[in-house]
Amino acid sequence: MELAMGKVNEVLFMNRGEGESSYAQNSSFTQQVASMARPALENAVKTLFSKDFHLQALNAADLGCAAGPNTFAVISTTKRMMEKKCRELNCQTLELQVYLNDLFGNDFNTLFKGLSSEVVGNKCEEVPCYVMGVPGSFHGRLFPRSSLHLVHSSYSVHWLTQAPKGLTSREGLALNKGKIYISKTSPPVVREAYLSQFHEDFTMFLNARSQEVVPNGCMVLILRGRKASDPSDMESCFTWELLAIAIAELVSQGLIDEDKLDTFNIPCYFPSLEEVKDIVERDGSFTIDHMEGFELDSLQMQENDKWVRGENFTKVVRAFTEPIISNQFGHEIMGKLYDKFTHIVVSDLEAKLPKTTSIILVLSKIDG
């Protein structure tokens, strides 16, 4: 079953709640990524004060916010930098309006439960902060024209609106048999389909934001990417490769129909810096102020016990993959699947899992 656009919008979300497998409890890696990207966000906020906006309120949106602590850090960082600039410039009191966006399946209840006074402060502070939820797909319009000064998105833009089109032959045969993402054994058409889908979706994202962001407004985007030119390089596909192996083992045990594996392709693409740069320049609505890639260990390397490291990695992966994986293969076998995944990860630790590459992209809306 290929995932079409409407279906992806229904099943793409992080594990809900605050339990052992929840995203809220297993977002330590994305917190590391956000920490690395924080200077870019701080600089973007400072830059906004150098532009002639005559601000009374700064409107900011966090797109694909999920329900972990990263969103709270974004709010706190933005608010803190606004307070600092207001003191430096002796400007009038500003207000901060933050819009938190994700798809309809997102756990907005857990998200808003976590919005303590430590995050948003109180309305008598230098920069009063107001927060609203905005459910919907960021691949389309979410806000009125020229209403946003700052857009932030972390580890969301690499998700696609649907599984790439054209991954079955005219005879209806799966072209990426036994895999759920690009791999070394995938034919060229699979790689081309994934890049084409990402190009289409990222262009839609930029087009929607070009209408919503004010001229000279900023976007800070952090997404999973790759350094290698080859999208099948283990650096960018190892998580999906190991998951496909785990699923295939359950197929061999008769617990999953082989056809379900052969027809499933994860709606996600990890682009290179060159691919992202090319799409932004082709769109022409934004200038690239800053762009860089950086690497982080995929596992908590300070933990010596390889089983603990493997189990921790599985929890992180399960938190962001279980909803969409269980929709395809069934909720009842998720325990067995992720146990199998842990064993595969631990065995691969002997060969050392590759580092994870992330991309920071800072854009300014072109005036005119």
Curated annotation (Swiss-Prot):
<feature type="binding site">
    <location>
        <position position="224"/>
    </location>
    <ligand>
        <name>caffeine</name>
    </ligand>
</feature>
<feature type="binding site">
    <location>
        <position position="265"/>
    </location>
    <ligand>
        <name>Mg(2+)</name>
    </ligand>
</feature>
<comment type="pathway">
    <text>Alkaloid biosynthesis.</text>
</comment>
<feature type="site" description="Involved in substrate discrimination">
    <location>
        <position position="331"/>
    </location>
</feature>
<feature type="site" description="Involved in substrate discrimination">
    <location>
        <position position="316"/>
    </location>
</feature>
<feature type="binding site">
    <location>
        <position position="158"/>
    </location>
    <ligand>
        <name>caffeine</name>
    </ligand>
</feature>
<feature type="binding site">
    <location>
        <position position="102"/>
    </location>
    <ligand>
        <name>S-adenosyl-L-homocysteine</name>
    </ligand>
</feature>
<feature type="binding site">
    <location>
        <position position="155"/>
    </location>
    <ligand>
        <name>caffeine</name>
    </ligand>
</feature>
<dbReference type="InterPro" id="IPR042086">
    <property type="entry name" value="MeTrfase_capping"/>
</dbReference>
<feature type="site" description="Involved in substrate discrimination">
    <location>
        <position position="268"/>
    </location>
</feature>
<feature type="binding site">
    <location>
        <position position="262"/>
    </location>
    <ligand>
        <name>Mg(2+)</name>
    </ligand>
</feature>
<feature type="binding site">
    <location>
        <position position="103"/>
    </location>
    <ligand>
        <name>S-adenosyl-L-homocysteine</name>
    </ligand>
</feature>
<keyword id="KW-0808">Transferase</keyword>
<feature type="binding site">
    <location>
        <position position="137"/>
    </location>
    <ligand>
        <name>S-adenosyl-L-homocysteine</name>
    </ligand>
</feature>
<dbReference type="GO" id="GO:0046872">
    <property type="term" value="F:metal ion binding"/>
</dbReference>
<feature type="binding site">
    <location>
        <position position="320"/>
    </location>
    <ligand>
        <name>caffeine</name>
    </ligand>
</feature>
<dbReference type="GO" id="GO:0032259">
    <property type="term" value="P:methylation"/>
</dbReference>
<feature type="site" description="Involved in substrate discrimination">
    <location>
        <position position="224"/>
    </location>
</feature>
<feature type="site" description="Involved in substrate discrimination">
    <location>
        <position position="152"/>
    </location>
</feature>
<feature type="binding site">
    <location>
        <position position="30"/>
    </location>
    <ligand>
        <name>caffeine</name>
    </ligand>
</feature>
<dbReference type="Pfam" id="PF03492">
    <property type="entry name" value="Methyltransf_7"/>
</dbReference>
<keyword id="KW-0460">Magnesium</keyword>
<feature type="binding site">
    <location>
        <position position="70"/>
    </location>
    <ligand>
        <name>S-adenosyl-L-homocysteine</name>
    </ligand>
</feature>
<feature type="binding site">
    <location>
        <position position="138"/>
    </location>
    <ligand>
        <name>S-adenosyl-L-homocysteine</name>
    </ligand>
</feature>
<feature type="binding site">
    <location>
        <position position="176"/>
    </location>
    <ligand>
        <name>Mg(2+)</name>
    </ligand>
</feature>
<feature type="binding site">
    <location>
        <position position="264"/>
    </location>
    <ligand>
        <name>Mg(2+)</name>
    </ligand>
</feature>
<dbReference type="InterPro" id="IPR005299">
    <property type="entry name" value="MeTrfase_7"/>
</dbReference>
<keyword id="KW-0479">Metal-binding</keyword>
<feature type="binding site">
    <location>
        <position position="23"/>
    </location>
    <ligand>
        <name>S-adenosyl-L-homocysteine</name>
    </ligand>
</feature>
<feature type="binding site">
    <location>
        <position position="65"/>
    </location>
    <ligand>
        <name>S-adenosyl-L-homocysteine</name>
    </ligand>
</feature>
<comment type="function">
    <text>Involved in the biosynthesis of caffeine. Catalyzes the conversion of 7-methylxanthine (7mX) to theobromine and of theobromine to caffeine.</text>
</comment>
<protein>
    <recommendedName>
        <fullName>Caffeine synthase 3</fullName>
        <ecNumber>2.1.1.160</ecNumber>
    </recommendedName>
</protein>
<feature type="binding site">
    <location>
        <position position="159"/>
    </location>
    <ligand>
        <name>caffeine</name>
    </ligand>
</feature>
<keyword id="KW-0489">Methyltransferase</keyword>
<dbReference type="GO" id="GO:0102741">
    <property type="term" value="F:caffeine synthase activity"/>
</dbReference>
<dbReference type="InterPro" id="IPR029063">
    <property type="entry name" value="SAM-dependent_MTases_sf"/>
</dbReference>
<comment type="similarity">
    <text>Belongs to the methyltransferase superfamily. Type-7 methyltransferase family.</text>
</comment>
